[in-house]
Amino acid sequence: MTKKRIAIIGAGPSGLAQLRAFQSAAAKGAEIPEIVCFEKQDNWGGLWNYTWRTGLDQYGEPVHGSMYRYLWSNGPKEGLEFADYSFEEHFGKQIASYPPRAVLFDYIEGRVLKAGVRNLIRFSTAVRWVEKAGDKFNVTVCHLPEDRTYTEEFDHVIVCSGHFSTPNVPYFPGFENFKGRVLHAHDFRDALEFKDKDILIVGTSYSAEDIGSQCWKYGCKSVTVSHRTAPMGFNWPDNWQEVPLLQKVEGNTAYFKDGTTKDVDAVILCTGYKHHFPFLPDDLRLKTANRLATADLYKGVAFVREPALFYLGMQDQWFTFNMFDAQAWWVRDVIMGRIALPDQATMEADVIDRVTREDAGEDDYAAIWYQGDYVKELIDETDYPSFDVEGACKAFKEWKGHKKKDIMGFRNNAYKSVITGTMAPMHHTPWKDALDDSLEVYLQN
């Protein structure tokens, strides 16, 4: 009998979780399908694979990365720790709770290096088109260095390309004549560019909070945040203000809905991202808002209208790496015949039920527990190592409280690992004073 062939699109955290899931089954003696992972970048890690580039890459492809220098985790690492590969195992000791970008990339890479899955990835290979042909998928890709296009046949396709790389870019009158710089968070790379400048941030997402904090930390003159519905409401520094929605820009002056104005040197649009899958035809393409209960995905992963197609990591996220693991193990077991999918009507009812339950939640705490329950639900159906999901939810709740108490100091707190039970040490330098975010300096605890 011919082995099934599986195409994984993307080698970021969710794609790497899927590779690890299959490798885990093989390590236990199971016969796994033939796996091919296509990755547009020349290295794994997805968004965590930092690049200085913006706009287009060396091959004329849209730059995938939205990562910037000096980024530190904006949530405790205890909420994302791999159940099968702890921070202590990787670093040989417990580390502080809010690692910088380079530290988290090192951790992500460590697990897949140990698993030995790099040979399953075709790097610098962009997926151009996926179409259903009978009971198979034809996947057309381009090897970018050679500009060579070819098509291969697969039994299943797993989309792991993420949803934080195609920016949502609104227009405001006057942008075309603004004398400063207008950019989306996707193209933000270095807070030092905005030293001694008055910056305007449009949006109240996590990127607004974090990019504003970065610019404050590295010496911008002032931060003004424009909100559409409500301010973030934290206890910001004196040179930080929140105002209603931007209406227009004239010269260097920004005009807001309440009639106030502010002269600014730069506008940073922290206005979110789009689920964007240009390689998929309309009947296979996921169309969903950024929410916990995604549209058209049974158990949050199986595409209802074509259940041989899966999407990983498409939810809005409290949980990240460990949720991708839970999803990847579950998808693996469906493909390997360990879990049977129900009929389409049952899957559609599941989607509706998840949306209804999410909508019934009244606040962020309800959302945290909602997603925690989802992670537990998937883990209970596979052999993924169980871990203290409730403890992770409690860490997220503490994190929310720490941010409310001190938005510029919340990263100075420590939490207990839900995998090993070890308490994280306090970092050797308060976040606002830690200007060197290198791996070597961070690990000097």
UniProtKB/Swiss-Prot annotation:
Q: What family does the entry list? A: Belongs to the FMO family.
Q: Any keyword Oxidoreductase? A: yes
Return the protein name.
Trimethylamine monooxygenase
Gene this chain is encoded by = tmm
Q: Which residues bind FAD?
A: 14, 39, 41, 47-48, 64, 74, 127, 317, 320
Q: Name one Pfam family in it.
A: FMO-like
Function text? Catalyzes the oxidation of trimethylamine (TMA) to produce trimethylamine N-oxide (TMAO). In vitro, has a broad substrate specificity, oxidizing many nitrogen- and sulfur-containing compounds, including dimethylamine (DMA), dimethylsulfide (DMS) and dimethylsulfoxide (DMSO).
EC number(s): the record gives 1.14.13.148
Q: What GO terms are given for molecular function?
A: flavin adenine dinucleotide binding; N,N-dimethylaniline monooxygenase activity; NADP binding
PANTHER family referenced in this protein's UniProt entry, alphabetically: DIMETHYLANILINE MONOOXYGENASE (PTHR23023)
